């Protein structure tokens, strides 16, 4: 779904041309005003009459990753990137932007420039031109510290793991998660609104919000990964507001004690530590509770005798502590569940967003498999097809528009090979995203000559592997 940023010097290219450009991105300086005046032909597009004002332009995020060794000020880097974007006439699509070779400051300090948030437009075959867009630049560095554990008492399990965000471990995770159009953007907008309402002092007695997200659905659909990726993305977006961002992943199993009534006390103790973190106003804290049903089990089950009575105290303690965190503006609680019917209704009611994350759609399955094959091509595990041309697997929408192209007759052409990939994606209906990302490995293990695997042969092996995996999953 992601494609490199493209240059637009005329009308927006059709989707097939955009895909071709994605294979070999280039960024060319726009012609200066003096050069245009000296000629009778203008090479750069001019904003049409009645173009949007600055307030009406579409906000597009530009994420700028600094080198780990860079000591440049974020303000200076932001200004340099804004000047670079203003000096060029561009169309905006998700993907990397080449760093210009004539800018030594950016070359020395910036590792990557990435355009984000345009997927909703490109899904509808709309191209965002430079005069329609107001770029919002976010400058950040990745933390390489890794997770830290909160040691438990008496050799017990640690109660939580902690990451400083944005973390190197989660870099690229957001882009690798593919869902129905709009799900990720909906979560981003929700979090931004929740933080804004709190910062502006909106009266919670009149307008209620809890800053709690509940993602539910079958196992293997990427709910936990989406929570971590969301925290990473928000830490980048709010870097200018919060100097420190943390992700606290709660180890739910550590909160249950063999001693009666002790579990509720462990929950209270954990949230007391979290509250100490959020007392620092410049610290944005994300609390991740995976498989929250283990903590927020329905109290009705305990009353009926099917659950230990101590679980009532755990649920009560959890709800009480979450209500206490509500008064702090710099904390967001992210939760996941595989069994929503087992969660206490009082907890479900507190969640602002209850988003279902189901098995990937056909488009998502195709793009997941496509991203896997592109990675295998990048590292050389798969060889390019015959004819000397580099293999370019088409995006889902480009394939839909080019599937009747005469090139289909060419068994080594991009359309034909993308069609084989599409067939594999169709067969995989019902498989989780986790299983889909295993398929290329299983397919490679099944080929006769894995050391020199042709892309065409690999795709046929992928289809057979998908059929076998689906058959085994159905018993």
From Swiss-Prot:
Highly expressed in young panicles. SMART domains: AAA. The keyword Chaperone does not apply. Coiled coil: none annotated. It is found in: Nucleus; Chromosome. Disruption phenotype: Male and female sterility due to defects in meiosis. Pfam families: AAA, AAA_lid_TRIP13_C, TRIP13_N. GO terms for molecular function: ATP binding; ATP hydrolysis activity. One of its GO terms (biological process) is meiotic DNA double-strand break formation. Keywords: ATP-binding, Chromosome, Meiosis, Nucleotide-binding, Nucleus. GO terms for cellular component: chromosome; nucleus. ATP binds at residues 217-224. Interacts with PAIR1 and ZEP1. Belongs to the AAA ATPase family. PCH2 subfamily. Plays a key role in chromosome recombination during meiosis. Required for the initiation of meiotic recombination and the recruitment of PAIR2 onto meiotic chromosomes. Essential for meiotic DNA double-strand break (DSB) formation. This is Pachytene checkpoint protein 2 homolog. The gene is CRC1.
